[in-house]
C-alpha cells in the first residue's frame, strides 16, 4: 500500500475531507477496494493451486482450497502478483451515497456561574453519541472529547475583535483564548450503538455533531 500525501503530481483528485464524510464515504470506498482486492487475491491463489476460483476461500493470512485444505500464503500471492502474473493485485474504487444518515448526540453540562462577573466554570459534561457502530471506539471517544472542548471554546471563550483601525486585536493565542484541559472539568462520553446499513460495518459520521452540541447545552 502506497499512500502519497500533499503531492498533487501523483495524488488523485479529491474534493476534501469534510462534512462528516471521512468514515461514512471514504470508509465505504475502502470496503469496496478491499472486497475487490480479495477477489484478485483469490484468483491468483487459485492459479497457484491449479483449481477454479470458486474452489478457494480467503482466510485472512492465506487462501485455502476448500476441498483439500491446501493453503497458499499472502507472501507467495504477493510475489506471484509481481512476477509472471496477468491479474493485477491493485484496485481503485469510489463511493457516493444518495443518503446521509444523521448521527445523534445528547450533551448535558453542569456549570458554576458567577452572577456578578458572568464567569462560567465547567464542572461536569456528559455526552451520549449515536454514530452507528464505531469503527474505532477509542478514536471515536477521543474525537468526541476533542469536539466537546472545541464547542465549549467556541461558546465561552473564542472571539475576534478589531481595533479602531480595523486590525484584529487577537493576533496570537496570548489574546485569542482557547480552552485547556483545566477548563473542562470532568468529561464523560458514552456511545449508544445503532447499525447503519449504508455505512461501513454499520458506522455513521461523527465529525460535526460533537462540536455543535456543547453550545446549546
Q: PLM features: what roles do these ranges have?
A:
Residues 2-217:
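C-terminal catalytic domains of large/alpha subunits in multi-subunit enzymes
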Amino acid at each position: 500500500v502506497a499512500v502519497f500525501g500533499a503531492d498533487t503530481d501523483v495524488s488523485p483528485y479529491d474534493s476534501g475531507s469534510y462534512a462528516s464524510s471521512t468514515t461514512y464515504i471514504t470508509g465505504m470506498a475502502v470496503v469496496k477496494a478491499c472486497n475487490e482486492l480479495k477477489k484478485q487475491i483469490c484468483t491468483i491463489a487459485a492459479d497457484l493451486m491449479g483449481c477454479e476460483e470458486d474452489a478457494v476461500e480467503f482466510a485472512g493470512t492465506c487462501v485455502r482450497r476448500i476441498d483439500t485444505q491446501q493453503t497458499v500464503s499472502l507472501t507467495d500471492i504477493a510475489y506471484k502478483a509481481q512476477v509472471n502474473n496477468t491479474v493485477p493485485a491493485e484496485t481503485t474504487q469510489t463511493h457516493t451515497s444518495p443518503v446521509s444518515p444523521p448521527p445523534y448526540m445528547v450533551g448535558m453540562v453542569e456549570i458554576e456561574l458567577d452572577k456578578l462577573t458572568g464567569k462560567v466554570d465547567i464542572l461536569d459534561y456528559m455526552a451520549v453519541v449515536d454514530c452507528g457502530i464505531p469503527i474505532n471506539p477509542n478514536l471515536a471517544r477521543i474525537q468526541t472529547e476533542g469536539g466537546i472542548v472545541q464547542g465549549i471554546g467556541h461558546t465561552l471563550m473564542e472571539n475576534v475583535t478589531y481595533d479602531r483601525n480595523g486590525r484584529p486585536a487577537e493576533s496570537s493565542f496570548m489574546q485569542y483564548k482557547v480552552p485547556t484541559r483545566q477548563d473542562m472539568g470532568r468529561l464523560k462520553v458514552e456511545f449508544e450503538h445503532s447499525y447503519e446499513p449504508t455505512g461501513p460495518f454499520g458506522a455513521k459520521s461523527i465529525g460535526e455533531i460533537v462540536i455543535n452540541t456543547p453550545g446549546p447545552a
